[in-house]
Curated annotation (Swiss-Prot):
It is found in: Nucleus. GO terms for cellular component: nucleus. InterPro entries: Pirin, Pirin_C_dom, Pirin_N_dom, RmlC-like_jellyroll, RmlC_Cupin_sf. The keyword Nucleus applies. This is Pirin-like protein. SUPFAM superfamilies: RmlC-like cupins. The keyword Nucleus applies. It comes from the Eukaryota. Belongs to the pirin family.
């Protein structure tokens, strides 16, 4: 294991946030990192939740407008259905990339017994894309590119790593990489220099940014400063698993009211009114209830 970064300007950790458990939805437990008061958002990212849900809890019918949600199952299965008649179940290792655009009403509920776990990321849309038609990309685990070398394995949900590239279309340019490092291994991942980036530790502990940095355990979100890429070392005796997420900043005002994310307060008021009255993208919401 080398003790130095391959980057002349490695990205260092500039902020560390512990994602504490809280209640959300209907009886669900989430660990929120981005979206907490101390890390309100990290352009273009609005929220990251690590969720843990057992039946009958879940996320019953609720609306969205103005952003994308990316749901990545770590354990178990979730069934999603919406007011446009779309219904699907994602299982361990699967991803659902949902563009809410001008409006969606949907439910997300556990699809089986036991505890269902996953990550949900909210990605902002630029003003020109906020009112587009909703769309979905569902990625099955076996179809998601993966690579492995020198004790490091990666699943490439978006972006590229270790010579492999994801085919997922991201309206806001995004990378989303799921890494596992065996004990004693290291990895150096380039990140576009103009992008904001952070990582979330799912299990184990690692040294991030510089080899002499203090190791950080699971359920922490680490915001990375500017530079060419991230260097990480697993000096422990157990595997380290973390997701590395980066994106091109949108650099527009963010006004959020619950499940609506727009650029101005008046647009938020309009979204709330559209949802209440069932118009401008929410036409089907008044007659629809999930089964």
């Amino acid at each position: 294991m080398s003790m130095s970064s391959i980057f002349s300007r490695p990205r260092l950790v500039v902020k560390k946030v512990l994602a504490r458990a809280q209640n959300e939805g209907d009886g669900a437990i989430v660990r929120r990192s981005i979206g907490r008061p101390e890390l309100q958002n990290l352009d273009p990212f609005l929220m990251l939740d690590e969720f843990s849900v057992s039946q009958p809890a879940g996320f019953p019918d609720h609306p969205h407008r103005g952003f994308e949600t990316v749901t990545y199952m770590l354990q178990g299965a979730f069934t999603h259905q919406d007011f446009a008649g779309h219904k699907g179940t994602i299982r361990t290792g699967d991803v659902q990339w949902m563009t809410a655009g001008r409006g969606i009403v949907h439910s997300e509920m556990p699809a089986g017994p036991g505890t269902q776990k996953g990550l949900q990321l909210w990605i902002n849309l630029s003003s020109k894309d906020k009112m587009i038609e909703p769309r979905y990309q569902e990625l099955l685990h076996q179809d998601i590119p993966k690579a492995e070398k020198d004790g490091v394995s990666v699943t490439i949900l978006a972006g590229e790593s270790m010579g492999k590239k994801s085919q997922v279309f991201t309206r806001t340019p995004t990378m989303y990489l799921d890494f596992t490092l065996k004990p004693g291994s290291e990895h150096h991942q380039p990140i576009p220099e103009t992008w904001n980036a952070f990582l979330y530790i799912v299990e184990g502990e690692g040294a991030f940014g510089s080899s002499d940095s203090t190791t950080t355990p699971a359920h922490h979100c680490l915001v990375l400063g500017p530079g060419e890429g991230l260097s990480v070392w697993n000096k422990s005796s157990k595997p380290l698993r973390f997701v590395l997420i980066g994106g091109q900043p949108i650099n527009e005002p963010v006004v959020q009211y619950g499940p609506f994310v727009m650029n101005t307060k008046s647009e938020i008021m309009q979204a709330y009114q559209d949802y209440q009255l069932g118009k401008n993208g929410f036409e089907r919401s008044r007659q629809w209830y999930s089964k």
